Every structure is written in structure tokens, then in C-alpha cells.
Regions:
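Structural micro-motif
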Residues: 70, 76-85
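Non-catalytic, surface beta->alpha helical segment in thiol-disulfide oxidoreductase systems
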Residues: 88-114
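A short beta-strand-turn-helix
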Residues: 11-28, 70
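Conserved Rossmann-like nucleotide-binding pocket used by diverse enzymes
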Residues: 8, 34, 60-62
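Short, Lys/Arg-enriched N-terminal segments with co-localized hydrophobic residues
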Residues: 1-7
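Conserved helix-turn-beta segment immediately C-terminal to the redox Cys motif
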Residues: 26-28, 45-64
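Conserved redox-active cysteine motifs that mediate thiol-disulfide chemistry
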Residues: 33-47
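Alpha/beta-hydrolase fold active-site loops
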Residues: 28-29, 82
Length: 114
């Protein structure tokens, strides 16, 4: 749908960066817990990119490789991936587990926001 713009999805590589990007963020932020070997995670990549282009002015989009930051995945009890968590002012609001089609993903995010 959107061509030319590069999506702004921040990759988180440390607990400190997580605190900067999510915990201390005012407003909505989203984190995608994923792994390179996960097929459904790879299916969600373009869905996330398009969602960021649509909702990027309302939600700060981030992603975490669970193999790189296992302790952070443990902190949020990530049992299945992809797991996508929506935060508001650093507090978890809601989460989605598994791959979701584009329209449904954007619709669910819009419904999760106030």
C-alpha cells in the first residue's frame, strides 16, 4: 500500500535501551518479540512495517530478538513468538500472540488504544 517510505521500527539490543524506548516512553509503544528462525515472525515483518507507516504517529514501534535478549523475553513471560505487546506510558496495555493479517493487526491496535 505504501511505497518509498522506510518504516521506523527500532531494534532493541539491551535492557537499558528497552527502558529508554519503552519504559520511559510517554504515549503508546509497541514491542514485537521475534526470532530469525521463526516463520510466523518473518510473516509479520511486512505487516509490522505497514502498520508503522499507518500508525507510526500514534505508536512507537520496536522489536526484540528473543535469542539476543532472552532475559527481557523472560521478564515478559514470552512463551510463543511472535508476541506483540502494546504499552502506554511504559505499562503493558495488551498483547497479541501469533501472526495476524494486515487489516486485522491494524484494527486490533486501533481498538487497543483509548
Amino acid at each position: 500500500i505504501f511505497k518509498g517510505e522506510k518504516p521506523m521500527i527500532t531494534e532493541i539490543h539491551s535492557n537499558e535501551q528497552f527502558d529508554t524506548e519503552i519504559t520511559n516512553h510517554k504515549g503508546y509503544s509497541l514491542i514485537d518479540f521475534w526470532a530469525t528462525w521463526c516463520g510466523p515472525c518473518r510473516m509479520m515483518a511486512p505487516v509490522m512495517e505497514n502498520a508503522e507507516k499507518v500508525l507510526g504517529d500514534k505508536i512507537h514501534f520496536c522489536k526484540v530478538d528473543v535469542d539476543e535478549l532472552q532475559d527481557l523475553a523472560g521478564r515478559f513471560d514470552i512463551m510463543s513468538i511472535p508476541t506483540i505487546i502494546l504499552f502506554k506510558d511504559g505499562e503493558e496495555v495488551n498483547r497479541m500472540i501469533g501472526a495476524v493479517p494486515q487489516e486485522e493487526f491494524i484494527s486490533q491496535l486501533e481498538n487497543m488504544m483509548d
